[in-house]
Structure formats: C-alpha cells, structure tokens
Amino acid sequence: METPENRAAFQSASSLADACRDRQILEGRAVICDSSHNLVVDCGCMRGLIPREEGAIGMNDGSVRDIAVISRVNRPVCFLVTGFQKNEDGKTIALLSRRAAQELCMKEYVSTLVPGDIVNARITHLETFGAFADIGCGIVSLLPIDMISVSRIDHPRERFSVGMDITAVIKAIDNGRISLSHKELLGTWEENAALFSPGETVAGIIRSVESYGAFVELTPNLAGLAEIKEGISPGQQASVYIKSIIPSKMKVKLIIV
C-alpha cells in the first residue's frame, strides 16, 4: 500500500480512473464486510466496493468459502478498478475486483515461476504444520514447518508472525499448487558456523532434549549438541560454551553453562 504508484492512484478520482484504464493492480485496506459479504475498501480519495463474487477466484463456483472474504477486514487487499458508480447517498464509489487482480497475477507472474525462484511473500496465517504465505494478490502457498529452518521448531510462530514480509524459495509446483521453502536463504552450515569460534560462550535456544543430549540452536540454520543439564526444556534460552566445531562432520559440540 505504501508504494509510490499506489499512493499516486489514491490521490484523486481521475488518478483512480487512470489506474482503471491501465489495469493497474492496487492495494487498499478493507474496512467493512457487509451482510452480503461485499468488501468496502479505503481507496484514499473515495471508498471502493468489492462485490462478493469478485472477492476471490473460486467464489462463484463455491471452491472458496466466504470466510476468505470476511477475514480480509482490516487487512490489505489487492484489486483492479473496474468502474465507478453512485451509491444510495449520491457519492461516487469505485467498483473493484480482487478476483480479476488474482487472475492477472496468475497469468503474468505466478505462471512464470519455477522451482528455485526467490519470491517475496507475506505470512497470512500459521498452523502447526507450517505457515501460509501470500505470494501475490491473495494467492496463498504453503511453507511447511520443516522447510522454515534447519534447526527444528515446534510451531511456525517461533519464526514468523501474521503480516510479516519474508522472502522464500519456490520449492515445488504440483498441479498449480506451490510449496515454499525458507531455510535455503538462511545460509549454509559453513556460513553459519563461521560466525562462531571454539572457546566462545554464546546465547542459544534449547530446541529438543533427547536421551543422548540437548540440541541447542545457535542460529536458525545451525544447532549444536550439548550434554543434558538438569532443569532444561525445549524453548528455554541458554548460555552455551562452544567446545568444538568440526566442519568435516558438520557438528558443533556445546556445554550448557
């Protein structure tokens, strides 16, 4: 919403009309979802209306539920301006389509993506098995929990929060469904290990406690093994002494202080 192009389009009715003519994808905040599940959007110089059937790809055939529209209230939504009309008070409002923006995004952007591409994404919601991220115009892809980082976590909220902007890698595309990965962007084992030296005492997070030791996260893509110490539990902050770093085995040995 804060791009110069977006701000310029919201300046006046004529600039919104230009955006309509040029089929420019804009983004505004949804402020109301009425009883018919139409979305009212703040377009700066005027209010805009996204009719329910224009709320998302799949609304018309029932493959997308109404909650996909209702949940957009107080959140940014992408859309195309499709026209203008007077409301019952005689005020001009912009007619908008999120569905059309999604179709344009699919055609000109998403359809060109291949595994290995790096994309910008925004976290939309979190589940125990992964994070869902908007890769453009409300087109959502899954980032599985084991693809978030090398260091294991119990829940994606340990890395992300809803509304957070991240970069991700296209991991796979299967029948139009896109899965993402994030851990490739956090550096290799060697790059992360180079940040530390034996003899240092550093901060870490206990990630798991096993019979043979405790795994302690030093960075999201680097963990070391420490002997179990009484009273430790997963998620706990800890100070650890780096006993050794063994590049040939990609191992870090630690002592919990």
Walk through the language-model features, giving the residues of each.
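Single-stranded RNA-binding regions, centering on S1/OB-family and related RNA-binding modules
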Residues: 1-257
